[in-house]
Amino acid sequence: MIMNSTNTVVYIKVKGRRPQGFLDPPKFEWNGTKERQLWTMVSNLNYSQDQIDWQNLSKIFETPEFFLKKRTYKLFAEHLELLQLQLEKKRDLEKYSNDQVNEGMSDLIHKYTPTLQNDNLLNVSASPLTTERQDSEEVETEVTNEALQHLQTSKILNIHKKTSDSENKPNDKLDKDGINKEMECGSSDDDLSSSLSVSKSALEEALMDRLQF
């Protein structure tokens, strides 16, 4: 058997006079059976008991108190280390199971993307990257055309049109039909301006939804 720090005790003899009352440590026998009995006693202490009765244990095992204290400390350290390993193993198993669940959820999220259609949130299969880019470009083109259509019916673009028309017309020639058309255009511009101011917020919300801001 190989000697090591756990199964070997080294005694050093020091020259000189022995102190008064010094006694040689008693010889005792220690084995695995006694160690299991010691662990059974110290690990099943009553909650009402504040501390271990080392003197009583020393009488039971016929072993010095200092040795019992060292062995008890060693046993608690070993069992605490074993308990720590069990807890780490349990955490690793839980983490592994959670990772599997997260991978499954990520696959589902990648496979299905939410789409708003007819005020209902539906799950449809995700398109490839090229299809998504084409859809994005089509949506942007559609939104741009829609915005231009709204702006063309408003007073914003009509200002430039009226300005160019007024520059082409001579200042000294205005017929009656032209005046009537200007009045009708002014009234229609007022109506469109009022409707534009009312639907401005709705148009902005529609643009934000389409562009997914």
Curated annotation (Swiss-Prot):
One Pfam family named in its UniProt record: ATG29_N
GO cellular component: Atg1/ULK1 kinase complex; cytoplasm; cytosol; nucleus; phagophore assembly site; protein-containing complex
Modified residues (Phosphoserine): 106, 187-188
Sequence ranges of Basic and acidic residues compositional bias: 162-184
Cellular compartments annotated: Preautophagosomal structure
Self-association and partners: Forms a stable complex with ATG17 and ATG31. Interacts directly with ATG31. The ATG17-ATG29-ATG31 complex interacts with the ATG1-ATG13 complex. Note=The interaction with the ATG1-ATG13 complex is induced by starvation.
Protein name: Autophagy-related protein 29
Gene (name only): ATG29
